[in-house]
Every structure is written in structure tokens, then in C-alpha cells.
Amino acid sequence: MSKLGALLTICLLLFSLTAVPLDGDQHADQPAQRLQDRIPTEDHPLFDPNKRCCPPVACNMGCKPCCG
């Protein structure tokens, strides 16, 4: 009976360790998706390279930094 109890305890410990996500766990696709969704400012079609900023209309579309 003690062998069965030890086996049950080991199985419960292993299951509980794998079932609970750790704090540092992230889905593998999240960083890649964030990079895909982000448009670099210099590549934004409304970015003004002479002023090195975006007009206020483009700021609503994610272009940073904003002019004025």
C-alpha cells in the first residue's frame, strides 16, 4: 500500500508542476506578432524625413513621434 501511495504522490506532484504555468511563460507567437504589428516610424508612409516626425493625422495611425 505504501508503494501505491508513493506512486500516487509522485504522479500528483509531476502533474501539478506541468499543469501550472510559471510566471515567465509566454506564448511563442506573441513576440513575433508584436513585431509584425509594429510599423517602424521611418517606414511609415506619412513619416516626414525632413522634419523627422509625423503629422497629427498619422499619429492616430501609430506613427511616432508627432509633429506639433
From Swiss-Prot:
Modified residues (Cysteine amide): C67
GO molecular function: ion channel inhibitor activity; toxin activity
Pfam families named in the record: Conotoxin
Domain of life of the organism encoding this protein: Eukaryota
Subcellular location: Secreted
Expression sites (tissue/organ): Expressed by the venom duct.
Keywords: Amidation, Cleavage on pair of basic residues, Disulfide bond, Neurotoxin, Oxidation, Secreted, Signal, Toxin
Disulphide connectivity of cysteines: C53-C67, C54-C63, C59-C66
InterPro entries on file: Conotoxin (IPR004214)
Modified residues (Methionine sulfoxide): M61
Gene Ontology CC, one term: extracellular region
Primary localisation category: secreted
Leader sequence segment: 1-19
Propeptide span(s): 20-52
Entry comment, domain topic: The cysteine framework is III (CC-C-C-CC).
Similarity field: Belongs to the conotoxin M superfamily.
Role, per record: Intracranial injection into mice causes scratching, hyperactivity and circular motion.
Protein name: Conotoxin tx3b
